[in-house]
Amino acid sequence: MASLKLQAVTKSYDGITPVIKQIDLDVADGEFIVMVGPSGCGKSTLLRMVAGLERTTSGDIYIDNQRVTDLEPKDRGIAMVFQNYALYPHMSVFDNMAYGLKIRGFGKEQIRQRVDEAARILELEPLLKRKPRELSGGQRQRVAMGRAIVREPAVFLFDEPLSNLDAKLRVQMRLELQQLHRRLKTTSLYVTHDQVEAMTLAQRVIVMNKGVAEQIGTPSEVYQRPASLFVASFIGSPAMNLFAGSVSADGCAFILSDGVRLPLETPRPQWADRRLTLGIRPEHIQQTTSALGVPMALLTLELLGADNLAHGRWGGQSIIARLSHEEMPAAGSVLYLSLPPAALHFFDSDSGLRMES
């Protein structure tokens, strides 16, 4: 195992436009970190810099407390798993897994021992003589992981390894990756655009946006206390409801853009002169009686089996509430909703940052 450290790392291809703005990250021995964000946010570029496939514009990278910023990929003690498997079609599973060791001059017996052990861990033993074309997508991805495992790297790097698999197989492979990490305990940096992968695999999540690490924290921290409007809107399915507005002069109510007032449990007069955004997750909205709740005109109801999603309008803006599977109001009806004060989030609309009490 090894630690991984990124110190003030930046990347720009033209010397003017930053692709990666200053990133600082400390990954502990054996930690599993997931970088998540939309396409083009810089997560794969950052991973490639750790691998040595891209040069940093500034800053340094350390693996096991050794500066590797200028080292070639082969000298960094890393192994990378790609989304397209990158298997040699004319080679057997055994030879694909062994190839990297052969070109590094390992002996036949050492190669056999390492490949056999990786095949046992990944349940590939019956497939070692097959060619990649004879394997399923999930089996090919396990071979790609096996090729990384036999190198016994200090750090595993994963670049969207499950993106080419169908939904059912992605679930299976997520479980296998969790089990693999528990067994090997190798420091891992994983890139995905899929927030479900991020939340289920990570010990800590890095939410990337336009080359910036918007938030670094545990899955629970990122979900329960998003640091910015971007994190609030990106993490969660469906996303957090967000309502533009402002706080009244006395600080006792949040006023939506169309004048609807929502009483605040704790007065916040210090926020009265700011443009704010209120957020609440769909599962935290509760149905209540008309005397206590705010009315929502129901537009559509999504039946998901375990629960239902009610889509409507409130305060002139769209809102989604997660209801139990037993609650099935008709489209066009009016629901009365309660927004518990403890479940409310507030953000500065101009900076996008979370407001702290």
Label every model-predicted segment.
Residues 36-38:
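The feature captures the beta-strand-to-loop junction immediately N-terminal to the Walker
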Residues 51:
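Helix-to-loop junction immediately C-terminal to a conserved catalytic motif
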